[in-house]
Each structure stands twice: as structure tokens, then as C-alpha cells.
Swiss-Prot record:
This is 3-hydroxyacyl-[acyl-carrier-protein] dehydratase FabZ. Keywords: Cytoplasm, Lipid A biosynthesis, Lipid biosynthesis, Lipid metabolism, Lyase. It is found in: Cytoplasm. SUPFAM superfamilies: Thioesterase/thiol ester dehydrase-isomerase. One of its GO terms (biological process) is fatty acid biosynthetic process. GO terms for molecular function: (3R)-hydroxyacyl-[acyl-carrier-protein] dehydratase activity. It catalyses: a (3R)-hydroxyacyl-[ACP] = a (2E)-enoyl-[ACP] + H2O. Involved in unsaturated fatty acids biosynthesis. Catalyzes the dehydration of short chain beta-hydroxyacyl-ACPs and long chain saturated and unsaturated beta-hydroxyacyl-ACPs. Belongs to the thioester dehydratase family. FabZ subfamily. Gene3D superfamilies: Hotdog Thioesterase (3.10.129.10). InterPro entries: FabA_FabZ, FabZ, HotDog_dom_sf. PANTHER family: 3-HYDROXYACYL-[ACYL-CARRIER-PROTEIN] DEHYDRATASE (PTHR30272:SF1). The gene is fabZ. CDD domains: FabZ.
Length: 144
């Protein structure tokens, strides 16, 4: 299990854009499972939607990407690197995510060649599928 401090040591995201609260399972370079405790205090709920708060789908995808970045950057050879989105394929949203939900974020990295990787991602709430997608990413030097 990784705490929020350990996550922040691996990825550069910070409030309000750090969307993973903890990592509950980690196989470096292979797989990560994270959790996001969705609070009514999230800044995006002010406008999405007043009186009917729903977590934006793009932020669910970002939370999945951050979980995948933790899996990739936990490899010693990727220490100090930056993971960037290279693409999203087949994204599907199956359930709304609301304040009070615990979003479970599962990313399985399938392939990594010359700094480009692919992973299968799923987000669930109470074992119900909320989102699934194939994520493409690039591991790069943060100064480039």
C-alpha cells in the first residue's frame, strides 16, 4: 500500500489535480490498484452539476492514468521520469460517480517499448463498472 505522500514522491500531480488517494496493490511495472475517495468538496462539483454532482468522465480517466503512472514509475529504471498521456482508446462510461463514492482504479500495463506503453484500465464503484479504457502513455525525461 502506498500513502498519498508516497504517491506524490512518484508523480508530480498536486491538489486539486492529484486524483488518487492511495495505492492498495502494486506490482511495479505491471499493475496498480488505487482508490479515490470522492468528496462533496471536490472543486469540480461546483459546476458539474449544481444540485446534481457527477464526477466528470475525463477526471475518472485522469485518475486511472495517474494510477498507471504510479505502476510505471515504481520501476527503478523510471525513477525521476514523467509519464504523459499518448492516447485513450475505447473509453466507455457505464455508471455515474458521485460524492461519497469510493472509486477503485485498476490499471494493468500490457506493453512497454522504447518509452511507449499501453495499459488496460477499469474504474469501479462498489464492484460496478464506472469506466473502462485502453490507455497509451509515454515515459519521458521531465526536462524535455
Amino acid at each position: 500500500m502506498l500513502s498519498i505522500q508516497e504517491i506524490m514522491a512518484l508523480i508530480p500531480h498536486r491538489y486539486p489535480f492529484l486524483l488518487v488517494d492511495r495505492i492498495v496493490e502494486l506490482e511495479p511495472g505491471v499493475r496498480a490498484v488505487g482508490e479515490k475517495l470522492v468528496s462533496a468538496n471536490e472543486p469540480y462539483f461546483q459546476g458539474h452539476f449544481p444540485g446534481n454532482p457527477i464526477m466528470p468522465g475525463v477526471l475518472i480517466l485522469e485518475a486511472l492514468a495517474q494510477t498507471g503512472a504510479v505502476a510505471a514509475l515504481s520501476l527503478p529504471e523510471h525513477a525521476g521520469k514523467l509519464v504523459l498521456f499518448a492516447g485513450i482508446d475505447g473509453a466507455r462510461f457505464k455508471r455515474v460517480v458521485r460524492p461519497g463514492d469510493t472509486l477503485r482504479l485498476e490499471v494493468q500495463l500490457e506493453r512497454m517499448r522504447r518509452g511507449i506503453g499501453k495499459g488496460q484500465a477499469r474504474a469501479t464503484v462498489a464492484d460496478q463498472l464506472a469506466c473502462e479504457a485502453e490507455l497509451l502513455f509515454a515515459v519521458t525525461d521531465p526536462t524535455k
